[in-house]
Design a protein with these regions (language model features):
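Short coil-to-beta-strand transition motifs
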Residues: 1-5
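Long, highly charged, low-complexity intrinsically disordered interaction regions
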Residues: 12-90
């Protein structure tokens, strides 16, 4: 299983009936499998609300979609609390 951290760039698709998402994330680090700074993440995330520009950690399998290229098929998502000074709210 691969763990990937990134900032939510945008929600490309959301099926409200089954909570299936297609997301675009801006990667927080360099990954060998990534073809650039962005990665598509797909998966079903029940009882979870995404906020654009927030940092998330995804766990899943890297897949090669025949039409859309490299994606992370995620089964786990967690918000990441940033630990730098700019992230602190007073």
């Amino acid at each position: 299983m691969q763990t990937v951290e990134g900032y939510l760039n945008k929600i490309i698709f959301h099926n409200k009936e089954n909570n299936y998402y297609i997301l675009s994330i801006f990667l927080n680090d360099k990954y060998d499998f990534a073809e650039g700074d962005y990665l598509s993440v797909v998966g079903t995330f029940n009882d979870f609300e995404f906020v654009e520009d927030d940092l998330y950690s995804f766990k899943g399998e890297i897949v090669q979609h025949r039409k859309y290229g490299i994606q992370l098929s995620a089964i786990v998502v967690e918000p990441v609390i940033e630990k730098d000074k700019e992230a602190l709210v007073w």
